Amino acid sequence: MNGQVIKTIGDKYLVKNNLGKTYSCRLKGNFKIKNIRSTNPVVVGDYVDLSFDLKEIMIVKLLPRKNKIVRKSVNLSKRTHVLASNIDQALLIITLDEPVTSRSFIDRFLVSAHANNVNVVLIFNKQDLLSKELLKKQAFLKKVYQKIGYRVLCVSFLNDDLSMLKEIMKNKLNMISSHS
């Protein structure tokens, strides 16, 4: 049987099959050493094959990914850290104040997403906190990213903008990310 990983906690994986039933699973012992160049071989979004043992349910095979979001592993320079896979879109939450999301963080995220065939929606949050100067900076960044093909939204989640976000996410497997 196979299913999709919907949650990971330590060495436990929650996998949902196509009938909607969920299973708590672990990785088969030798799974982690099979030519995998990432720090985490199985991530949320992965499709996996399961084996039912008398004691527990094991993930025995990782099925091919249609896409993934990766970052460089912090301590292991030649390895990557996969954040999610098989996603329909990534939502990158950006703040220009309290705290500031750096332009380099945004660009690194976009490069990784583009290289791995993931659509990204940029969401500038905390509109209610922005000064006139920061609103100008946001307008500039919005124009830059729209010009190169990204959908950009400016919101304040304190207001009624959550309904807009729910509509964007509707019927899609989404990854939400920010700098912290």
Spans of model-derived segments:
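N-terminal accessory targeting/assembly segments
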Residues: 1-103
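Cofactor-binding loop segments of dinucleotide-utilizing enzymes, especially the Rossmann-like FAD-
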Residues: 8, 95, 125-126, 157, ...
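Signal for well-folded cores of large energy- and translation-related assemblies
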Residues: 10, 111-114, 146, 170
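Residue-level signal for inorganic ion chemistry
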Residues: 45, 113, 125
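Conserved beta-strand/loop subsegment of P-loop NTPase cores
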Residues: 87-94, 117-127, 149-154
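Short histidine/acidic/glycine/proline-rich micro-motifs that form metal-
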Residues: 96-99, 127-132
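Histidine-anchored nucleotide/phosphate-binding helix
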Residues: 104-119
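Canonical P-loop GTPase G-domain recognition
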Residues: 129-180
